[in-house]
Amino acid sequence: MENSTGLKSSLKTRHIVMLSLGGAIGSGLFLGSGKVIAQAGPSVLLSYVLAGLTLYVVMYGVGKMVIHQDDHKAGMAGVVAPFIGDHWAHFADWVYWATWMAVLIAEEAGVSTFLAILIPGVPLWVFALVVAVLGTAINLWSVKAFAETEYWLAFIKVAVILLLIALGIYLLVINDAHLGFVADSAQKVTTKSTAPSFAPNGFSGFLTSLLVVIFSFGGSELAAITVAETENPKVAIPRAIRGVLIRIISFYVIPIFLFLHLLPWSEVSNPDAASPFATIFARVGIPHADKIVLVIIVIAIFSAVNSAIYATSRSLYSRIQGSSTYVGKKLGKLSKNQVPTNAILVSSFVLFIGVLLSAVLGDGFWQFVAGSISFTISIVWILLLVAALVLYFKHKEVTNWFVKLATLVVLIALSLVFIMQIITNPWTLSVFALVICLLSYFSYRKKKSIIEKTFIL
C-alpha cells in the first residue's frame, strides 16, 4: 500500500516495537554499562529510571501527534510540522539528519574495530567496506527487508539480555559462591561497607551517568519517521510506544541491578574492567564468553548503522519531496519497491568515505565529529516535546492536565540538561555543533529544500 509520500506502507506493529527497542538497546549496555556504574554507583539505577520516564513522555507525545494527523508525511518534519510550523520542522529534520550521519561514521568505525578483534590480521578498511556494502544493500532492497533485518537484530539483543536476567536471578537464588560470585553480602555493592554511598562520586557522578543514559536511549524516536511507511500508523505507532517504558526499564534496570548484586564493588567500580555481561557469562561457565559478547556488540553496532542509513535517507527524502528541480527529482526517485534509492545512496556515501579514511587516517577524526554533535539528539527531543505541548493545549480533549504537566516538567528538565551539556563539553565540540544547528535553521526557504539552494537550482 502506498501513501501521499509515494513510499510503501509495509511496516507492521512488531517492526515498530523492535525498531524503538533496538534503537534504545545499543552497544553501550553491553560494553559501557560497567563504566556508567563506576561513575554513579548504585545511583545509576535512578538514572535509568528517570531517563526511561523521560523517553516515555517524549514517545507518548509522538504517539498523540501521529493519531491527530490524517496525512502522514516522511521524516521527522512530517510529524512535528503541523504543530511547530515548517521552519522549525525543517530545522528538526536537518539536525536529526546530521546526528544520524555522525552515528553512521562513528558506528562504522566501531563495528570495524570490534570485527578486527574477532578476526585479527584483516585490515580495518576491509571490515568498513563490508559494513558499508551490507548496510546499503539492505536498505536498497526494500523497507520490509530493512524492517525484518532490524527486527531480528533487535531480537538477538533482547534474547541475550533475557538470558542474562535468567542467569542472574538463578545465581541470586542459589547464591552459589563456588561459581566465583561473592556469597558474603558484606562484599556486595549495595552495602555501606563497600560502596561509600548511594552515589560514590556525588551529584556530578550521578548527573554524568544520567546524561550518558538519556542519550544512550537516542534512536527510540526513530519510530516517529516510520509513519509514512507503516500500515495503519494511527494504531501501530501508539501501540508500539505504550510498551516502550516497561521494556526499556526492564532491559536496562534489571541487568544493572543484577550487576550490582552479583559482582563485588572493586570489580564493577573499575571502568577498565571487562564487560559485566562477559564476566557473568564467563563465571557461569559459558565457554568463550568474551567472544560471545563481542559478537553481540558487533550486532548492536551494525544495527545502529542500518538504522542510521534508514533515518538519514528518509529525512533527506522528506526535505526534497515535491521538488521540481533536476537534483530534487533525482533524489526523490523511488525504486520499484518504493524506497528512495538515490536518497539512500547519498546518505550512505559517507560510509564509503569512511572506508578510505579508515585506511589512511583511522577513526580519530570521526570520533571527534560524532562527539561534537552527539547531544543534538536532545534538540530533537525538545522539539518533539514542544510540538506535543502545542497539540495538548490546542486540543484540550487530547489528554489530561497530568500529562500536560509531566510534559512541561520533562521539557524544562531536558532543556537544563542540554545547557549543562554545552557548558561541560569542550568548547570546540560545542562550537562545531552550534554551526551545524545554525546552518540547519537558516537554510530554510519556503517550498525549497537545502539541496535546491546548494546547487542554486
Curated annotation (Swiss-Prot):
Bilayer disposition of the protein: Multi-pass membrane protein
GO cellular component, one term: plasma membrane
Location(s) in or outside the cell: Cell membrane
Keywords: Amino-acid transport, Cell membrane, Membrane, Transmembrane, Transmembrane helix, Transport
PANTHER family tied to this protein: GABA PERMEASE, GAMMA-AMINOBUTYRIC ACID PERMEASE
UniProt function note: Involved in phenylalanine and tyrosine uptake. Also has affinity for tryptophan. Plays no significant role in the excretion of accumulated phenylalanine.
Name recorded for this polypeptide: Aromatic amino acid permease FywP
Gene3D superfamilies named in the record: Amino acid/polyamine transporter I
Endpoints of the signal sequence: none
Location, primary (coarse class): membrane
Family of this protein: Belongs to the amino acid-polyamine-organocation (APC) superfamily. Amino acid transporter (AAT) (TC 2.A.3.1) family.
GO terms of biological process kind: amino acid transport; transmembrane transport
Transmembrane regions: 16-36, 43-63, 91-111, 114-134, 154-174, 205-225, 243-263, 292-312, 342-362, 373-393, 403-423, 424-444
Phenotypic consequence of gene deletion: Deletion of the gene reduces the efficiency of growth at low concentrations of the aromatic amino acids.
